[in-house]
Amino acid sequence: MPLLKLVFLGTGGAVPRADRMLPAIYLEDWLGHRILLDAGEGVQYRLFQIGVAPSSLTLVAVTHMHEDHVLGLPGLVITAKFLGGKVKLLGPRSAHGILSRLGVDVADGYDGGRLRVRCVEVCHTVDACGWLLEWDVGYKLDLKKVEGLPKWALTKLIRGEEVEVGGRVIRPEEVADPAHKRYRRLLYTGDTGPCPRMLKTVGEVDVLIHEATFADDVDPNKAHEEGHSTVADAVEAAKALRAGVLVLTHISARYTDKARHRQLAGRVPPPPHVYVPDDFDTLLVQL
């Protein structure tokens, strides 16, 4: 079953609070990939607190080079090396030079077979990547169309491979259930204001993790000038992307709690289902 585990290690932005650390999200999928999205200050300690060794990470993907998103990297990289691992780092191309000084491999995308990760340009004040994660969950077959086929053929068809049975070549598209989506997608925006080009590039997602630095008490134009979003901006993006799940994070330290964000989120009729997590909250999402 395609299942994602998301642990929100840091849900703040720019300045930490005692109960709200800087941006970092741990993602674990049903295939065994372990991915860290952004690396706020002290993130390695938070990983240890949830029982995850830095050396076990498949990828660390940072959205941009503002300090609140990357100050946890040096310690994370060093500890991973001490533990016998090596961090695979993703970041914007403009940051590859400085990131490579950490002694790690740096790229702007990842292809792990059934999981692909790529950079999507967002609208911030510096060069920044949103990270689009796409899983190939295979085909769901139309039982009437595959009746009588051997099990080995069914297995290959589900994986997306064509087969030859009795001299007939069968392509998975020919016998698939048209109502089933082969790919599942998650977008993590990092810092961004409203971004039409991001929406156009991405198309649709199942899960959207979108910054909501501000609730509704700040002039939206001011927020956008700073390269940030309000709750309303994030909801609008989720609807445009037809997301089933929207997670709001990167909450400004100006808010002593997230009550207003949650009030606004609670007014949104699903879809999307809107969540405003606290630090260390875990969200399980079935794709």
From Swiss-Prot:
Catalytic activity entry: Endonucleolytic cleavage of RNA, removing extra 3' nucleotides from tRNA precursor, generating 3' termini of tRNAs. A 3'-hydroxy group is left at the tRNA terminus and a 5'-phosphoryl group is left at the trailer molecule
One term of GO molecular function: 3'-tRNA processing endoribonuclease activity
InterPro entries: Metallo-B-lactamas, RibonucZ/Hydroxyglut_hydro, RNase_Z/BN
EC number: 3.1.26.11
Residue sites binding Zn(2+) 2 per the record: D68, H69, D191, H250
Keyword Metal-binding: yes
Note accompanying the cofactor annotation: Binds 2 Zn(2+) ions.
Residues annotated as catalytic: D68
Co-factor(s): Zn(2+)
Keywords: Endonuclease, Hydrolase, Metal-binding, Nuclease, tRNA processing, Zinc
Matches recorded under Pfam families: Lactamase_B_2
Binding site for Zn(2+) 1: H64, H66, H124, D191
Top-rank taxon: Archaea
UniProt record similarity statement: Belongs to the RNase Z family.
Assembly, per entry: Homodimer.
Function according to Swiss-Prot or TrEMBL: Zinc phosphodiesterase, which displays some tRNA 3'-processing endonuclease activity. Probably involved in tRNA maturation, by removing a 3'-trailer from precursor tRNA.
Annotated protein name in UniProt: Ribonuclease Z
Organism: Pyrobaculum arsenaticum (strain DSM 13514 / JCM 11321 / PZ6)
Source lineage: Archaea, Thermoproteota, Thermoprotei, Thermoproteales, Thermoproteaceae
Gene: rnz
